[in-house]
Amino acid sequence: MRLPITIATLERRAMLRAITAASGTALSSALLPRHVAAQPASGAAAADSGHFEMADIKTGDNTIFIRRYGKGSSPLLMVHGFPRTSLMWRYMAPSLANRHTVICVDLRGYGRSGVPASADDHYPYSKRAMADELVAVMDKLGFSRFDLVGHDRGGRVSYRLALDHPEKVQRLAVFDVIPISEGWGHADAKFAMTYWPWILLSQKAPLPEKYLSGAPGAVFDNPFGQGSFGPEVRAEYTKTYRDPARVHAICEEYRAAATLDIEHDNKDRDESRRITCPMLHLWASGGPLDTLYEQDGGSLGIWRKWADHVEGEAVKGGHFFPEENPGETTEILTRFLSA
């Protein structure tokens, strides 16, 4: 009888591939640590032999779910975007754990993290509120300063964290996004057709909630949401969109992006606040960022208006290249973090 494949098994295999690639040696899966089953952690942590842990971290009135890889001397926080969860880092985190303590979080409203109530102005789901919460998570874990990587919405939370808490961030890497105010400021028909979640999910409730809840898996069938994953991972991702409270939270985050987040960006620009730590920007080769902003020197040119020390390059793959091409992505990121 064929046994069902669990998310924990998939992460175990990802770790095996990462270790094998790094060492050039084929390893038996029996030599790898046993992973915790894919279920919500109870208490402070649910740990195995030390290579992979899951925990619920209390942050005031909310709880943030984390996956923790390794025990390296340099802490690294990794933040997913829409429509993913911390599971998107399953290929990269094991390799990065050779040198880092890697903390992969589920943002509030996503995955297994809590779903705090929103407000009329959407502030609880602004990038500022989400960034503040991640600082609280890292403080709880004992990390006063850390490297930071974010993809998609997680990239926007990450650059906001670097602007609001510059003393916390050693190095910043932002994958396949530009600042929120720049995105809206450059918006045209091509932008709307490409980045449809910006337009749809920011509409007044309950319209977008009804669309997402009515077809929870549809976002993963659209080219924007497709990526390199099998049915087990798809099922794990889709769980978020079967929960009406989480769907509302995600829409609230997009509403904040169309209002408060723009205000916060504009205030930074007016006050000449910039990202001062070393920054890496990666984007998908042949993806929208490769062509939408050519008049500005590409997305890298846009980031140079916001950051003092930024470098970047294109990575083969689509928007979800951390999953589609984790080897090249990890290699570039490791080089940046080691500089």
Locate predicted features:
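Catalytic histidine-centered segment of alpha/beta-hydrolase-like enzymes
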Residues: G318-P326
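Conserved HGGG/HGGXW glycine-rich cap/lid loop of the alpha/beta-hydrolase fold
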Residues: Y69-V115
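N-terminal secretory signal peptides
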Residues: M1-L10
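N-terminal twin-arginine translocation
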Residues: T9-R17, T25-G43
